[in-house]
Structure formats: C-alpha cells, structure tokens
UniProtKB/Swiss-Prot annotation:
InterPro entries cross-referenced by the UniProt entry: MECDP_synthase, MECDP_synthase_CS, MECDP_synthase_sf
Catalytic activity: 4-CDP-2-C-methyl-D-erythritol 2-phosphate = 2-C-methyl-D-erythritol 2,4-cyclic diphosphate + CMP
Positions that bind a divalent metal cation: D10, H12, H44
Segments crossing the lipid bilayer: none
Protein name, entry field: 2-C-methyl-D-erythritol 2,4-cyclodiphosphate synthase
Function: Involved in the biosynthesis of isopentenyl diphosphate (IPP) and dimethylallyl diphosphate (DMAPP), two major building blocks of isoprenoid compounds. Catalyzes the conversion of 4-diphosphocytidyl-2-C-methyl-D-erythritol 2-phosphate (CDP-ME2P) to 2-C-methyl-D-erythritol 2,4-cyclodiphosphate (ME-CPP) with a corresponding release of cytidine 5-monophosphate (CMP).
Keyword Acyltransferase: no
Record site: Transition state stabilizer: H36, T135
Naturally occurring in which organism (per UniProt): Carboxydothermus hydrogenoformans (strain ATCC BAA-161 / DSM 6008 / Z-2901)
Gene3D superfamilies: 2-C-methyl-D-erythritol 2,4-cyclodiphosphate synthase (3.30.1330.50)
Pathway, per record: Isoprenoid biosynthesis; isopentenyl diphosphate biosynthesis via DXP pathway; isopentenyl diphosphate from 1-deoxy-D-xylulose 5-phosphate: step 4/6
UniProt KW keywords: Isoprene biosynthesis, Lyase, Metal-binding
PROSITE patterns (UniProt xref): ISPF
Origin superkingdom: Bacteria
Amino acid sequence: MMIRIGFGYDVHPLVEGRKLIIGGVEIPFTKGLLGHSDADVLYHAIADAFLGSLALGDIGQLFPDNDERYRGIDSGLLLQEVYRRVRERGYCLNNLDAVIVAQKPKLLPFIQKMRENLAVLLNTAIENISVKATTTEGLGFAGREEGIAAYAVITVKEVLENG
C-alpha cells in the first residue's frame, strides 16, 4: 500500500467587519479573517496539504482569488472538492494533524467541533483528525493579533480494491 504525505500552510489577516470562521466554526470575536472566500485558514491549510500529497498544485491554482465564483464561498465546499480529487486518484485520508496559530481568541472551546466538522467533510473517523491551537507568546504577526495562521500535515493511503 502506497502512503503519501502532504504539508499545508495558510495565513489571513484579521480585520474588523468580518466573521471569524475556523474549521467551519463561527467563533465569537471582534475581528474576522480577510479573504476572497470565507477565509477559513484551517480548511485552506488542509486543502493545500491534500493537494501537496499528490502533487496537484495548490488551492490558489484551483480556486483563484480573482474568480468571482469563489467570492465568499464556504471553504468547506472547497475542501470537499479537493478531497474528491484525492479520492478520484485512488487515495483516502489516513490521518491529519493541524495547528492553528492565534494569540486571540482562545480556540480550545471550539477544537472538538472543528474535529467533528472535518470528520464529516472527509468521511472519516474523528480519531484520524487532530487539531490543536497555540499562541506565539506575543511574537510576530499572530502575536500582535494581526492575523491567524494554520499548518497541516496529512498522510493519504492508496485505496486497495481487494483489501
């Protein structure tokens, strides 16, 4: 059985007047992430990790930010399309490990719901999904509360027809 690994990273600036959506969860906060879509930084990092695992380019190539079809789109739909392409090539998720980097807000109360959302979107057991959050102890753009970043590492495994 062939196993492949993918790594993804995404970052968006925090701005006033936008909802903060991470991992498909709307999080109460005074600012939200700026982006062409709903700017779900976690879903974007995971999508790039999937694409990287099979050398399929990146999320910006598939869903360009100058294409009006994707303005304000739910990033869960983008992630589902990316995963459909992974499945179409004979692979499925083995496991996912992701980290969200944000000084504020505190994300721990929302992590379980993010994991549940991902398990449903990716049609997998929640045990295959790890999502964590950390701060930068006040350092850098995240520490200054200028933006939020996410990193994701995934492994995909070849789907065997007879086994």
